[in-house]
Structure formats: structure tokens, C-alpha cells
Amino acid sequence: MTETEMIVQGAPEPMAAGRRKLVWRRFLRNKPAVIGLIALLLMLVASFALPPLLKYDYQQLDYTALLKPPSGRHPFGTNQIGQDVLAQTLRGLQKSLIIGFSVAFISSIMAAFAGSVAGLLGGWTDTAIMWLVDLLLVMPSFIIVALFAPRAKGSGSILLLIVLLGGFGWMISARLIRGLTLSLREREFVRAARYMGASNWTIITTHILPNIASILIIDTTLAVGAAIMGETGLSYLGFGVQPPDVSLGTLIASGTKSALTYPWLFMFAGGFLILTVLCTNLVGDGLRDAFDPGSQRARSRRKDKAAEPAGKAAA
């Protein structure tokens, strides 16, 4: 095998596997990120596994318990029409997580494709894609989503909401990926692939995307929290998930008016929203430090650990 062929084929598999193990070990040393990941997985499992085990469905009415506080029968209490708040909160958490992960996945795929194509091809293709990015960035995306999302009914409204949020959430990431691609296309392994007749699609999938995978993973993780907050804001204003379905945003909106007199209508959905966004951000920060140990957070954490023995010795 010649040196050029080795460059084109990329790093050997054992080296890539070793790097993955190193990143995983760095991530595990970040306790806040690990706690955030565990909490996020527990909420994800609970939102899907617990509802079938509950006595009451999220739409079922209990006319003997209207606006009752948390009890053994209704652990999170009931609302104005006797619906179980625990069942509704789990249903809302489930919908918000589905929307958050789906929007983050769609926006990351669109950003990876648009940014890598624009950066690799250049010329009029780059100009056209960046013109579209600039156009979408100046458009009032919140108003557009608010106008079109409620027009669909049932599960179609959630699907349309995911598509709209994902369609307006990829532009900034695409700019970042384009800049990275402009740098990578001048590297020796990309030039060698061109000389050997590799197609643009092969170069993107084999050489460009694997080298920016860490950035995509971090961006996707952080986008989950942003998408959940966006859906919550739309649902809070009545433009997101439509009745009879619920999300954390609709539960917060319906419980805000009674937050002081009947706090259980508001605090459980609000608490899960805060916890979900916090956990996704902790995981995203942990992944960033794991992939880029030279980042400011990682350096400051190492300095703190190095200062601990010195402080103990001085004491």
C-alpha cells in the first residue's frame, strides 16, 4: 500500500477505536455531564415506560377528584377537570423529548449537508447556499412557525412542528461547518482523494464528515435543549402542540394562572422542563470538553484539580 493510498483511506480502525475510548474516558471523568446523561436517560425511559403502568390515562377524567393536591391516588394531584397531573406530565415530557431530539437530528443533518457541500464545491453553489442561509436568518421564523404549525390536526401538527423548527434551526451550524470544510478541503488527504478520482459525495462522506463528527455531535446535543425551549415557547402561546395532546409548554401555560393557589399544576411541568434543558446542556458541555481537551472549561477543571493537592499541603 502506497503512502497516498494510506492518506486517502484515513486513519486505521484501531487508532479510531482508541480515540473513541479516550473521548469516552474524558467524558466519564466529567461528573456533571455523567449525572446529566443519567438523568436524561431516566426521564426518557420514564416518559415511555411509566404511562402504561399508571391507573389513569392522561385524558381520563376523575370527577371525584377535581383540583386535588398530590396524594397516593394522584401523586402529582389533579387539574380542574380531574385529569391526573402525573400522567399529563409524563405525556408532555414524552412529546417534548420527541420534538427536541427530532428537531436536533433534522437540523444537524441539514447543516452537515449544506455546510459541507458549500465549503467543498465553492463557486456559485457556495454563493447560493449562503444566500439561502442569510435569507432564512433574517426571516421571522417564530412568526412563520406560529402561523403554520397549528393548521395541522392530531399527530400531523407535531410532525409539522418538527419540520418547521428543524427547517429554521440549521443555518448557524451550516456556517460553522462550511468554515471547517473550507479548511479541510486544502488538506493532503482531500487533495489525494481528488487526484485518485473520488467523487464529491465520496469526499464529503468519507473525509469531510468524519473529521467534523465531533462538532456535529456537540451541536446536536446542545440543539436538543434549544428545540425543547422553542417548542415550549410556541406551546405556551398556543401555537405548538394542539389539544387534546399535551406538552410541557401547554401544561405550563394552563397552570400559570393558578401557580400560587394550585402550584402542583405548574411546578412539576416547569421542573421537568428546567431539568431536561439543564441535563442536555451539561451533556453537551461534557462532550465538548471530551472532544476538545484544550477548551477553556477543560483547562480550568484541570487547574482546579491541580490546585487541590497544593491547598491540602499548605493546610
Where are these regions (language model features)?
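Transmembrane helix-loop junctions in multipass membrane proteins, especially transporters and channels
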Residues: 51-59, 120-127, 153-154, 177, ...
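Gly/Trp-centered helix-boundary motif
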Residues: 1-112, 116, 138, 142, ...
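Residue-level signature of the cytosolic catalytic core of signaling kinases
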Residues: 16, 59, 78, 121-124, ...
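Glycine-rich helix-loop "coupling/hinge" segments at transmembrane-helix boundaries
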Residues: 137, 148-152, 165, 180-181, ...
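Alpha-helical transmembrane segments of multipass membrane proteins
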Residues: 44, 48, 116-120, 147-151, ...
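Residue-level recognition of membrane-helix boundary sites in multi-pass small-molecule transporters
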Residues: 34, 95, 125-126, 141, ...
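Generic hydrophobic transmembrane alpha-helix motif, especially the helices
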Residues: 75, 109-111, 119-187, 215-218
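Amphipathic cytosolic juxtamembrane alpha-helices at the membrane-cytosol interface
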Residues: 21, 83-98, 102, 122-130, ...
